[in-house]
């Protein structure tokens, strides 16, 4: 299932979405440190443990759907920051996420609800 959407308001001006939306700001990140109680959770910088920045110069995180993978409960070393986000210009593979182009992302976004499942085969 999808939990919520993170988005860059300065870059993504118009879209429709039925699930919770959170604007990405410069101090937002996602904890990937298994020794932290915040592992696989949204955090704010400054942060003492390892975390991935969400406010990037590149556009891959302009739209991020948070996938309910290893979230409730969170299990250490099972994986963190597993998102559906925008693909990069080179269409290169992700490190565990799912990446799609902006146009199809915006097309499916209004169809997603809290009950929508994502199946990966």
Question: Can you say where each PLM-predicted feature lies in the sequence?
Answer:
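Cell wall/extracellular polymer interaction/catalysis modules
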Residues: 1-95, 102-121
């Amino acid at each position: 299932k999808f939990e919520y959407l993170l988005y860059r308001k300065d870059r993504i001006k118009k879209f429709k979405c039925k699930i919770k939306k959170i604007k990405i700001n410069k101090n937002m990140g996602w904890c990937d440190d298994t020794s932290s109680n915040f592992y696989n959770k949204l955090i704010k910088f400054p942060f003492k443990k390892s975390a991935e920045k969400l406010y990037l110069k590149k556009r891959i995180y302009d739209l991020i759907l948070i996938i309910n993978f290893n979230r409730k409960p969170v299990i250490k070393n099972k994986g963190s920051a597993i998102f559906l986000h925008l693909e990069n210009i080179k269409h290169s593979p992700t490190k565990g996420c799912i990446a799609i182009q902006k146009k199809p992302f915006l097309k499916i976004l209004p169809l997603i609800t809290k009950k929508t499942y994502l199946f990966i085969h």
